[in-house]
């Protein structure tokens, strides 16, 4: 289950990158910092394309999968827990003589 979600996560990440790069630019650097605000406020409302909507959905799915992958452990227990259990089982199996 974990590896299937991880594979899906990587595929969505690649498709999200591609869909982001395929989108049309909305201006140069000045527009990113508010330089093109007059055009966006007074101009015709921007029509969201299918690519824009797909990018939104892919981004949301990417975030949900990231949260799922952080919650779902790929194995039960951690390395530290396994080493503690191993040490405890070895300690029970051997008898220690009292220090004489």
Curated annotation (Swiss-Prot):
UniProt keyword terms in alphabetical order: Cell membrane, Membrane, Protein transport, Translocation, Transmembrane, Transmembrane helix, Transport
Source superkingdom: Bacteria
Gene Ontology biological process: intracellular protein transmembrane transport; protein secretion; protein transport by the Sec complex
A Pfam family matched in the record: SecG
Chain residue ranges for the region called Disordered: 77-100
Segments in the Cytoplasmic topological domain: 33-48
Gene Ontology terms for molecular function: protein-transporting ATPase activity
Biased segments, Polar residues type: 83-100
Family note: Belongs to the SecG family.
Complex and partners: Component of the Sec protein translocase complex. Heterotrimer consisting of SecY, SecE and SecG subunits. The heterotrimers can form oligomers, although 1 heterotrimer is thought to be able to translocate proteins. Interacts with SecDF, and other proteins may be involved. The channel interacts with SecA via subunit SecY.
Protein name in UniProt: Protein-export membrane protein SecG
UniProt source species: Aquifex aeolicus (strain VF5)
Source species taxonomy: Bacteria, Pseudomonadati, Aquificota, Aquificia, Aquificales
């Amino acid at each position: 289950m974990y590896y299937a979600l991880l594979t899906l996560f990587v595929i969505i990440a690649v498709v999200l990158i591609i869909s982001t790069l395929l989108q049309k630019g909305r201006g140069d650097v000045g527009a990113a910092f508010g330089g093109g605000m007059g055009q966006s406020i007074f101009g015709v409302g921007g029509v969201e394309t299918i690519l824009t909507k797909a990018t939104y959905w892919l981004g949301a799915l990417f975030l949900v999968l990231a949260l799922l992958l952080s919650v779902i452990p790929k194995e039960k227990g951690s390395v530290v827990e396994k080493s503690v259990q191993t040490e405890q089982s070895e300690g029970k199996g051997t008898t220690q003589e009292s220090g004489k």
